[in-house]
Amino acid sequence: MALVSIAPLASKSCLHKSLSSSAHELKTICRTIPTLGMSRRGKSATPSMSMSLTTTVSDDGVQRRMGDFHSNLWNDDFIQSLSTSYGEPSYREQAERLIGEVKKMFNSMSSEDGELINPHNDLIQRVWMVDSVERLGIERHFKNEIKSALDYVYSYWSEKGIGCGRESVVADLNSTALGLRTLRLHGYAVSADVLNLFKDQNGQFACSPSQTEEEIRSVLSLYRASLIAFPGEKVMEEAEIFSAKYLEEALQKISVSSLSQEIRDVLEYGWHTYLPRMEARNHIDVFGQDTQNSKSCINTEKLLELAKLEFNIFHSLQKRELEYLVRWWKDSGSPQMTFGRHRHVEYYTLASCIAFEPQHSGFRLGFAKTCHIITILDDMYDTFGTVDELELFTAAMKRWNPSAADCLPEYMKGMYMIVYDTVNEICQEAEKAQGRNTLDYARQAWDEYLDSYMQEAKWIVTGYLPTFAEYYENGKVSSGHRTAALQPILTMDIPFPPHILKEVDFPSKLNDLACAILRLRGDTRCYKADRARGEEASSISCYMKDNPGVTEEDALDHINAMISDVIRGLNWELLNPNSSVPISSKKHVFDISRAFHYEYKYRDGYSVANIETKSLVKRTVIDPVTL
């Protein structure tokens, strides 16, 4: 993503030469610049990971730089070789039968009390059922049933939380924590203050020394709830610290099991970087292996069978969409942009992980195309193009006419048409969904995005290190989040009239915070490599400039604290129960933020896409689950 600044690559006297230069006639000089590779936990260097910068000189004497990134990992032959039989109608029929059976499970909880559901467990049964179908990635089939179950639970919610059942005389930690999390995610007004009930007389969360499985699961629910925190909720911060420590200690004592794996997954990814399809894939592996709900009215085998089927049926759709995406990539002329990173399959994977409803093909493909273009532009502005060429390109983009590309270098002409054709194509899809032309929105986003690049170019040309405030405001735009999100969400079957769009897109708080997370988290992962390339400006360096005497470690601590605060603010913007904008209208912008955050969890997952990102592609797109 656009998370690096632009460096001047040629003097103005070279402009007349650069206009006729080609990206394909280059003489190469290489120098290696070491960069920090992060371990899986982001704590240590990986010696094998390094980044090199290639300096190239075209035949007409223009000096250029190229990032020595690894090539596209997913070639056309590999994509075409993928096979699946889960697109057959018989699998869809089997899934529909299972959907009907799961609906009966939901309905059985609404009938009269019986042996398996009664006044002493009816609340936890409902919450657990909702949580299960959501974690398994099959909740889209049960929207009415989920609402009915949560309405019932909420009707018994109080300032003391809830017990396991409506007639329970004491509050239960597992029921209350899981209820708090689930109700909050669905927009119900529930206060985190209920968690104070589970503290001892010293104001600390209480636990027993034995750490039984029941208690461990309760604390796991507490940890998951604590991640859905809003600004200023001290009890949620305390709950997160306590429960994380408790669970880490529990892992040292309990045997390897589905419970231990579930704890590791939740501690590893939390919530903001635990993408829904990724969570579904992981939860399929551990679901139904415990005995906690053996006396439940919930048939875990049916839920698991449906989850696996749905995962694989969508996998067959992913194959077709990937084939289309690869054809688009080739036909657009993208392979000729040899100076850039080609990560279209990785971007498609991110989109698949946050929107795997079949009807949202336009979103997935639009997101992959848009982010692919942003990344190529990032590399063009960051390393390959000269400042003078980039000024011409930026001005030509604002004219929005193919004839404007006539004055550009050959490689830029191709890039111009890729942007022009793709943006117009996605706008046509958006017009079908929204019933109005959205090109003006798209052009405004692209214009501001490229302007933010040019601002960074001027800073570098003049040697100016901006203040943190200057850098931060410009950097939120140059992060590319708004540009990546706007057009794809408009292709969805979700209405975005102007008054709703302004609460989701610029100038909304939701948009501002989503851009901020990408900027700040990206900087913490990229600033050392950027600095090694001579690109000094980052949130870390600008903060240190504003605060003389502050160490780099202090600056990182400050930025990480900012990220935590921004995440809580973003949670509030999504889930505020008093908001006039439905969660469904905000959810995908929020989830795009989660997807980008995941890519920077350990390292720059776009430049180094052959570790965690490759694993994500294989696990959620390439490989089906075993039935």
Curated annotation (Swiss-Prot):
Its main location: plastid. Mg(2+) 3 binds at residue 530. Mg(2+) 2 binds at residues 378, 382. Its EC number is 4.2.3.119, 4.2.3.120. The keyword Transferase does not apply. Keywords: Chloroplast, Lyase, Magnesium, Metal-binding, Plastid, Transit peptide. Residues 1-36 form a transit peptide. Binds 3 Mg(2+) or Mn(2+) ions per subunit. Pathway: Terpene metabolism; oleoresin biosynthesis. InterPro entries: Isoprenoid_synthase_dom_sf, Terpene_cyclase-like_1_C, Terpene_cyclase_plant_C1, Terpene_synth_N, Terpene_synth_N_sf, Terpene_synthase-like, Terpene_synthase_metal-bd, Terpenoid_cyclase/PrenylTrfase. GO terms for biological process: alpha-pinene biosynthetic process; diterpenoid biosynthetic process; green leaf volatile biosynthetic process; monoterpenoid biosynthetic process. Gene3D superfamilies: Farnesyl Diphosphate Synthase, Terpene synthase, N-terminal domain. GO terms for molecular function: lyase activity; magnesium ion binding; pinene synthase activity. It catalyses: (2E)-geranyl diphosphate = (1S,5S)-beta-pinene + diphosphate; (2E)-geranyl diphosphate = (1S,5S)-alpha-pinene + diphosphate. Mg(2+) 1 binds at residues 378, 382. It is an enzyme of class 4 (lyase). Pfam families: Terpene_synth (PF01397), Terpene_synth_C (PF03936). GO terms for cellular component: chloroplast. Its cofactor is Mg(2+); Mn(2+). The Asp-Asp-Xaa-Xaa-Asp/Glu (DDXXD/E) motif is important for the catalytic activity, presumably through binding to Mg(2+). Belongs to the terpene synthase family. Tpsd subfamily. Terpene synthase (TPS) involved in the biosynthesis of monoterpene natural products included in conifer oleoresin secretions and volatile emissions; these compounds contribute to biotic and abiotic stress defense against herbivores and pathogens. Catalyzes the conversion of (2E)-geranyl diphosphate (GPP) to (1S,5S)-beta-pinene. This is (-)-alpha-pinene synthase 1, chloroplastic. It comes from Picea glauca (White spruce). The gene is TPS-Pin-1.
